[in-house]
Amino acid sequence: MTKQFAVIGNPIEQSRSPELHHAFAEKTGVDLNYQKRLAPLDGFESSMRSFFAKGGSGMNVTVPFKEQAFALCDVLTERAQIAKAVNTLWMENGKLHGDNTDGQGLVAAIQALEWNLENTTILILGAGGATRGVIYPLVQAGAKKIVIANRTLARAEQLVDDLKTAVPQAQLQAISLNDLEGDFDIVINATSASLSGDALQLPEKLKFKYAYEMAYGKPSSFLDQAKQRNVPYAEGFGMLVGQAIEAFSIWNNVRPQLKDFL
């Protein structure tokens, strides 16, 4: 019997999840159908519950419903609890389970690039939900210190305070985007600057070996500056594929290989 999956969001037209999951299915022999599902901004819960009531096997959640999905889950993975957002849902024994695979997607993408994560010092630009979701997996993968830089320093400080309890083994620090300096192994752009076209200027006194842009398929002043410095760089398509593979493997107990889809 064909398993039914979906990705839910608003907007949803831009999602590449169906093509990825159908490609994974073809590679692994899983019989599935995966659809885009547009939910009204005030209609996420009813749309999601209707999908599972009709026999849906699993659902991905995208903007702007990840925090709402988190709040509705009966059972959460540890990384979802820390992220306070859920992008992967499934029903098990009548209970709604939730996970957040974004951080693992980022880790898998970085590892596929053969950038070392062990004992690294990482700078993340931005202190929103995208950053919160990746801290724990980065630490699990070996990152030694993570510095979070944000335009509003108080927001970065709040995030660090929240995460210090959840991820006590990590060295976490908050700074202002105006105070970017020092040496880092990897800089990750998790700000919406690339999406909105706001140019984020990286000062000369900020040094880094690698640059990762979470967004993909759009012009990025962040990556332009990495190119000018001749620093190895990548955009977020690998992260997208990585998080999709993680969700696929949770639902289907088979894991496609990331390298086959990059």
Swiss-Prot record:
Belongs to the shikimate dehydrogenase family. The lineage of its organism: Bacteria, Pseudomonadati, Pseudomonadota, Gammaproteobacteria, Moraxellales. It comes from the Bacteria. The active site is at K66 (proton acceptor). Involved in the biosynthesis of the chorismate, which leads to the biosynthesis of aromatic amino acids. Catalyzes the reversible NADPH linked reduction of 3-dehydroshikimate (DHSA) to yield shikimate (SA). It comes from Acinetobacter baumannii (strain ACICU). GO terms for molecular function: NADP binding; shikimate 3-dehydrogenase (NADP+) activity. It catalyses: shikimate + NADP(+) = 3-dehydroshikimate + NADPH + H(+). One of its GO terms (cellular component) is cytosol. This is Shikimate dehydrogenase (NADP(+)). The keyword Oxidoreductase applies. Pathway: Metabolic intermediate biosynthesis; chorismate biosynthesis; chorismate from D-erythrose 4-phosphate and phosphoenolpyruvate: step 4/7. Its EC number is 1.1.1.25. The keyword Cell membrane does not apply.
